[in-house]
């Protein structure tokens, strides 16, 4: 194996193995200053975004060790409670569903929000990160908050925010201030219920100021190996941190499936605060994917039967046939089942308008940017990729890579594949690569870079990613792979397209898969706007 280095870009030539064809290390030098905030943000929000950017942003810099644990190293939840008190505790004015979990939070929250909306309820949803605009993080009734509404609220509470920052000696963070604004906006918009997604862990997350009195239910979707250092270094400590959102006397819906001892940790916490447990992966185990259909005006969907059974006698509580989910994969079916279980929990609490039909409509109308998202033919053509099939999926952990791999194997078993990958520096690059390479045989893997949280601090250099993928291939028995030059995310897409197009011996046009981070997805979607 020999590697040649150009002063401005990475050009690696590595011999090809029989099982793999190419890995391309793309050094994104000419696009390294791409920032989601600066390139795609609404110009009306300049003051608001500038205010937030003046604060400590852990999405950009990385989270300190142990910061998400319920320990002396954890974030100080007291300062968030004091901020909420200064804002007159807006989060006490409506019911809340609090959602935590390693993977599946965003999809589950979106499914649930749409189910409630289909039932006629006014719904607020707070999530992170955003893809194109910070407005996406705070939505009311299915739409991101408008710039004018956000500005009006910001200017009205700005003196309180400034006073709070001063009294907390500048320690309030970007996420804490934004969380306070979200809670305030939901009060202003008079929502019936808010679906609140935890940012990191649970116990010490800024969202964990919700009290039992207005908590409708807690939800823990999955437990996996992400943010390990910030959450204590083990699956057990991660489960402990996320179980911190379980509140006294309020039900908790567990997504899963979980390892038995991890489920035990969550159940133990629930028992200690007299919280009833609904295990979605158990009572929804009869749910299944029937096949993939191409629905006019919508695109690819997976047709599913969703069956939720009574835990005591296995009799169906909900039985929905041919539900067309717009996000693909068994993991998305599980997220839909989890959201359905939460909606049934709310129905039992008096939300009678959450009918079976509302559940169906809500599930079928849910789509999220960067989650099993296929570009339309027009979007592909806009990126100068005419006729290409392009899948955007923000998978960035071993577990989400496995889910992506299984979806591709099941739904597109004969497709020729090229991956375009960029990742954050705090992810397990080798494990991610091994998951994708262990069950798939891509024509090429093109490695590039994308800004993380609007900055470069947490972005992984493509040359580092290249070494991780080579190591993964070596551990799987593929000795070496060929690499070629590229500089930008868009250039990487064009190279992927060229690799697939140049093979005239195949009638299959292939598929380009953009993955490794929601931030590389953001780069692609931002390009469509320009």
From Swiss-Prot:
Binding site for Mg(2+) 2: 227
One Pfam assignment: Mur_ligase_M
Protein's pathway: Cofactor biosynthesis; tetrahydrofolate biosynthesis; 7,8-dihydrofolate from folate: step 1/1
Transit peptide, from-to: 1-33
Family, similarity comment: Belongs to the folylpolyglutamate synthase family.
Binding-site residues for Mg(2+) 1, renumbered to this chain: 128, 197
Ligand binding (ATP): 104-107, 371, 393
Name of this chain's protein: Dihydrofolate synthetase
Outcome of gene disruption: Defective embryos with development arrested after the globular stage, at the transition to the heart stage.
Residue pairs linked by disulfide bridges in the UniProt entry: none
Annotated compartments: Mitochondrion matrix
NCBIfam families xref list: folC
TM annotation in the entry: none
């Amino acid at each position: 194996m020999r590697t040649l280095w150009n002063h401005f870009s990475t050009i690696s030539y590595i011999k090809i193995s029989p099982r793999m064809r190419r890995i391309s290390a793309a050094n994104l030098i000419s696009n390294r200053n791409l920032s989601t905030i600066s390139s795609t943000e609404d110009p009306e929000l300049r003051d608001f975004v500038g205010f937030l950017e003046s604060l400590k942003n852990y999405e950009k810099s990385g989270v300190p060790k142990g910061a998400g644990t319920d320990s002396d190293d954890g974030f100080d939840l007291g300062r968030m409670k004091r901020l909420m008190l200064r804002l007159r505790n807006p989060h006490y004015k409506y019911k809340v569903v609090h959602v935590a979990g390693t993977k599946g939070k965003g999809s589950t929250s979106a499914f649930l929000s749409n189910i409630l909306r289909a039932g006629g309820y006014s719904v607020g949803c707070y999530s992170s990160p955003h893809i194109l605009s910070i407005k996406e993080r705070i939505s009311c009734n299915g739409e991101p908050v408008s710039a004018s509404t956000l500005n009006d609220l910001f200017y009205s509470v700005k003196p309180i925010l400034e006073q709070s920052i001063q009294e907390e000696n500048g320690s309030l963070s970007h996420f804490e201030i934004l969380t306070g604004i979200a809670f305030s906006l939901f009060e202003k918009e008079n929502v019936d219920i808010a679906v609140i997604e935890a940012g990191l862990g649970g116990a010490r997350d800024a969202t964990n100021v919700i009290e039992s009195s207005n908590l409708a239910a807690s939800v823990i979707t999955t437990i996996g190996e992400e943010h390990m250092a910030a959450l204590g270094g083990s699956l057990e400590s991660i489960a402990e941190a996320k179980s911190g959102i379980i509140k006294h006397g309020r039900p908790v819906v567990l997504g899963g499936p979980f390892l038995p001892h991890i489920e035990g940790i969550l159940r133990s916490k629930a028992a200690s605060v007299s919280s009833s447990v609904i295990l979605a992966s158990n009572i929804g185990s009869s749910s299944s994917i029937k096949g993939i259909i191409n629905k006019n005006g919508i695109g690819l969907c997976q047709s599913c039967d969703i069956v939720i059974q009574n835990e005591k006698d296995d009799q169906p509580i909900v039985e929905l046939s041919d539900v067309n989910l717009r996000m693909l994969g068994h993991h998305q079916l599980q997220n839909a089942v989890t959201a359905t279980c939460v909606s049934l929990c709310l129905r039992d609490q008096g939300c009678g308008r959450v009918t079976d039909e509302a559940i169906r409509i809500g599930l079928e109308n849910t789509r999220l940017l960067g989650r099993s998202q296929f570009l339309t033919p027009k979007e592909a053509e806009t990126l100068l990729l005419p006729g290409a099939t392009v899948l955007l999926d923000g998978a960035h952990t071993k577990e989400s890579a496995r889910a992506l791999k299984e979806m591709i194997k099941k739904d597109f078993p004969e497709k020729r594949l090229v991956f375009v990958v960029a990742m954050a520096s705090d992810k397990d690059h080798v494990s991610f690569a091994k998951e994708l390479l262990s069950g798939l045989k891509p024509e090429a893997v093109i490695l590039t870079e994308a800004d993380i949280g609007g900055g470069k601090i947490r972005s992984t250099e493509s040359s580092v990613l290249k070494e991780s993928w080579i190591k993964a291939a070596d551990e799987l028995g593929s000795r070496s792979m060929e690499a070629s030059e590229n500089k930008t995310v868009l250039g990487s897409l064009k190279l992927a397209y060229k690799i697939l197009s140049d093979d005239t011996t195949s009638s299959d046009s292939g598929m380009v898969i953009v993955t490794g981070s929601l931030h590389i997805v953001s780069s692609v979607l931002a390009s469509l706007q320009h």
